[in-house]
Amino acid sequence: MGFMKHNIVDNVAFSNKLRHVNPKLKVIFALSLLLISVFSTSFIVPLIIFFINSILLLFKAKVPKKIYAVFVGIPLGFGILNLVIFAFLFGTVEWFKINVFGFEIPVYKDGIELGLLLFGRMLGGVSSMLFLAFTTPMVELFYIFRELKMPDVLVDMMMLIYRYIFVLYEEYEKMKFAQESRLGTSNLKSTYKSLGALAAHLFIRAWEKGEKLNITMMSRCYDGKIKLLQTIENPSIKYILFIAIFDIFLIILAYLTKDFTLTSYIKI
């Protein structure tokens, strides 16, 4: 399999319909919604943020629905599990009981409310980060990091690590395919042996690629800083004001709904 096949996020980031929207504007939008989601005292606002991000990604950016479902599905599953655990194990105010094989298991109101809050925060935060990841290529984010005066060494390390995650993954798949074609995983004993050999060879391959990269960069007059040729203009003030007004609206809504409890409206 090729390198680009593994890097699904970058493929989508370069081909989505919001690709040419100012990346600084997308960073401001995504990070502001992330902060509102994380610090919201109401589960309603983070869920609204989740639906807004989902609509923008699926219908405006045209992110493939299957890809988005995969990336949202995993945290969604953990969120539902977390909600169930909080409903049964945390809380003091009993709402109702469930009879399971003669045992009555209580469900707590305050446990459900806390679980809903964490569930909403998780969905709002994850969708905000996915919006940024699916609409903005990493190279543009690295440039923005530079403009934010992050240390050059840190930005360079992030770029190299991001690149070589996928390079080493491709090496891993080649080695794994070679082992499987030679029946290296035919039983448990050979699987453990093959796994150890794969880890050792992958470490050696990573070391070799690091040495080659260092030689290549030094031969091209590397002076301790990777040059980024791209420049990004500052976004229009009117769009920033629009995002600010929208954020203020969400903050006010979060304040107005902070005492809202779902269980008080459902009678069992």
Swiss-Prot record:
InterPro entries found in the cross-reference section: ABC/ECF_trnsptr_transmembrane, Cobalt_transport_CbiQ, ECF_CbiQ
Keywords: Cell membrane, Membrane, Transmembrane, Transmembrane helix
An annotated GO BP: cobalt ion transport
Entry annotated with the keyword Membrane: yes
Record localization: Cell membrane
Keyword Membrane appears in the UniProt entry: yes
One GO cellular component, as annotated: ATP-binding cassette (ABC) transporter complex
Transmembrane segments: 32-52, 70-90, 125-145, 237-257
Short name of one Pfam family: CbiQ
Its membrane topology: Multi-pass membrane protein
Family affiliation: Belongs to the CbiQ family.
Name this polypeptide is given: Uncharacterized protein MJ1089
Organism listed in the record: Methanocaldococcus jannaschii (strain ATCC 43067 / DSM 2661 / JAL-1 / JCM 10045 / NBRC 100440) (Methanococcus jannaschii)
